[in-house]
Amino acid sequence: MKFTVFTPTYERAHTLARVYNSLCAQTFSDFEWVIVDDGSTDGTADLVAGWQTENRFPISYEKQPNQGKHIAVNLGATLAQGDLFLIADSDDAFPPNALQIFHDAWTAIPVSDRENFTGVTGLCVDPDGKIIGDKFPADIFDSTPADCYYRHGIKGEKWGFHRTDLIR
């Protein structure tokens, strides 16, 4: 499996469908969705169970006592079966070609060079399609997150994936 799309959630049954609908619309289908519920009491479990019966793609759901997002992410990384780990927050929506774009960017990196990369990051847009934060200085740009911020002054929301083996 190529991607694990991971969603930590807490009392977000009212927004979680945005992620689900975005995943249903993806043109790239080699992914699983791992959800870690951080102690919700709002019907999240029933909502996810309904989606699991639809069997559109693999969905794993784990509920834990409320411990915070960082603990949920650690559990999600442990449960991940994909090679690449992408966090989609419980209110996120993304275009139908998002996973395909990430896949294409990753496979454009020669296999022999991939061990030197932690993942791929892209720009985020608001619902009107306006870029949130600063653009990168080039379409393809190799950098560390620290260099992006401190050396290049790139700020604002970004979204991307990391190699699962490094997240663990």
PLM segments and residue spans:
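Nucleotide-sugar donor-binding/catalytic module of glycosyltransferases
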Residues: 1-168
